[in-house]
Swiss-Prot record:
The lineage of its organism: Bacteria, Pseudomonadati, Pseudomonadota, Gammaproteobacteria, Enterobacterales. Keywords: Ribonucleoprotein, Ribosomal protein. One of its GO terms (cellular component) is ribosome. Belongs to the bacterial ribosomal protein bL34 family. Residues 28-47 are annotated as: Disordered. GO terms for biological process: translation. The gene is rpmH. GO terms for molecular function: structural constituent of ribosome. This is Large ribosomal subunit protein bL34. Residues 31-40 have a biased composition (Basic residues). InterPro entries: Ribosomal_bL34 (IPR000271), Ribosomal_bL34_CS (IPR020939). It comes from the Bacteria.
Length: 47
């Protein structure tokens, strides 16, 4: 049986990366919430 999680950095960044977040109003709200919470990393693409 094939496992469901088949990692790909490209797909990960396209869906959850910084530019993907900035592209929509709701994505920007996500970033704002994470900034307010004090997250060290805002998105998966940020080191």
């Amino acid at each position: 049986m094939k496992r469901t999680f088949q990692p790909s950095v490209l797909k990960r960044n396209r869906n959850h990366g910084f530019r993907a977040r900035m592209a929509t109003k709701n994505g920007r709200q996500v970033l704002a919430r994470r900034r307010a919470k004090g997250r060290a990393r805002l998105t998966v693409s940020s080191k």
